[in-house]
Swiss-Prot record:
GO terms for molecular function: orotidine-5'-phosphate decarboxylase activity. GO terms for cellular component: cytosol. It comes from Hapsidospora chrysogena. The keyword Lyase applies. Pathway: Pyrimidine metabolism; UMP biosynthesis via de novo pathway; UMP from orotate: step 2/2. Residues 169-179 have a biased composition (Acidic residues). It comes from the Eukaryota. Substrate binds at residues 42, 64-66, 99-108, 329, 348. The gene is PYR4. The active site is at residue 101. One of its GO terms (biological process) is 'de novo' pyrimidine nucleobase biosynthetic process. Keywords: Decarboxylase, Lyase, Pyrimidine biosynthesis. It catalyses: orotidine 5'-phosphate + H(+) = UMP + CO2. This is Orotidine 5'-phosphate decarboxylase.
Length: 376
């Protein structure tokens, strides 16, 4: 049987034909950076996570996180850990993949994705799902992402102004109506007592009341404006040369196969994952898998594969061993060249190195070489 066309297609070619906007962006990013490397940043605290992302960022195209294992994760939307990761992603040119492995009924996974303290959808470009509960979980996540995207075309910017207190018995004709057209809502609050503003008495001896007019003005701004395009990047932060902003679309990877020994993801389960992906091509980017699962002519799903490891430097013939906890390892050459992976996921192979940048480059170079030999 002939190999699927995607196995011989370059990333730049696939970027032109794939339908998912985020997949197209990722393929372009891979081609621009000459990288098909994802770092699994399984670290214990937020400071280390940000440090690792900054050090390794130039070599990777995807950063995989587990926010719930990171001590000190700051959930503040604008300045917290997710926002700071997004800033580094923009600086170095990579996407954020929160390895949440959603695995529950549809309503629950939708809330886990969009609500709660983490609000994963706000900062993670990509998430994944364990489809054991059924296809409904994929459908619910897709619907949640679509609703979130629909709310993005316009943002409501609210400003509040408080007018000078005045006496109610003053002539209404003295009021300035110049801003009446801008006022969406106004609330009038009566202030009892003398707060330092002189109160005149009326002709019948009664004291006039003090009224403060508070105006709430709402302005609708396009979410595609340059103001939002900068996102949380500070002045001076620049995109990687030649790289545009990533699309606002979110993406899903379906956990179709695992690299751990004795896992229960059989062929029937994997096929169900493929069918669900085909039903939601506008949201599903591809799979976390151990082999390429594209089989129909119009399939162009991306495959990210964990369990990647290189022998120690200068010991290329050394045998790869598992970690003693069920993980099984393979080289980039096998995963990409033989199994058909598009992106290899590396964790401890880089994280435990004395020089993170050097080791990340070693993995990037090996994975890219395997890809170029595959499409040659």
């Amino acid at each position: 049987m002939a190999p699927h066309p995607t196995l011989k297609s370059t990333y730049s070619t696939r970027a032109e034909t794939v339908t998912h906007p985020l997949s197209a962006y990722l393929y372009k990013l891979m081609d621009l950076k000459a990288s098909n490397l994802c770092l699994s940043a399984d670290v214990a605290n937020a400071r280390e996570l940000l440090h690792v992302a900054d050090k390794v960022g130039p070599s990777i195209v995807v950063l995989k996180t587990h926010y719930d294992m990171v001590a000190g994760w700051d959930f503040t939307p604008e300045t917290g850990t997710g926002a700071r990761l997004a800033k580094l992603a923009r600086k170095h040119g990579f996407l954020i993949f929160e390895d949440r492995k959603f695995g529950d009924i549809g309503n629950t996974v939708e809330l886990q994705y969009t609500q709660g303290a983490a609000r994963i959808i706000e900062w993670a470009h990509i998430v994944n799902v364990n489809m054991v509960p059924g296809k409904a979980s994929v459908t619910s996540l897709a619907n949640a992402a679509a609703k979130w995207l629909e709310r993005l075309p316009y943002e409501v910017k609210t400003s509040v102004t408080v007018g000078t207190p005045r006496n109610t018995d003053e002539d209404d004709d003295d009021e300035d109506d110049g801003n009446a057209g801008e006022m969406e809502r106004s609330h009038t609050f009566g202030l009892n007592g003398n707060n330092g503003v002189p109160i005149k008495e009326s002709s019948d001896g009664r004291k006039g009341s003090i009224v403060s007019v508070t105006t709430v003005t709402q302005q609708y701004e396009s979410a595609h404006s340059p103001r939002l395009t900068k996102t949380i990047a500070e002045e001076g932060d620049m995109l990687l040369a030649g790289l545009e902003e990533p699309p606002l679309n979110r993406g899903l990877l379906i956990l179709a196969q695992m690299s751990s020994a004795g896992n229960f993801m059989n062929a029937e389960y994997t096929q169900a994952c493929v069918e669900a992906a085909r039903e939601h091509k506008d949201f599903v980017m591809g799979f976390v898998s151990q082999e390429a699962l594209n089989s129909q002519p119009d399939d162009d799903f991306i495959h990210m594969t964990p369990g990647c490891q290189l022998p120690p430097e200068h010991e290329e013939d050394a045998e790869l061993r598992g970690d003693g906890k069920g993980q099984q390892y393979n080289t980039p050459e096998k995963l990409i060249g033989v199994c058909g992976a598009d992106i290899v996921i590396v964790g401890r192979g880089i994280l435990k190195a004395g020089d993170l940048q050097h080791e990340a480059e070693r993995y990037r170079s090996a994975a890219w070489k395997a890809y170029t030999e595959r499409v040659r």
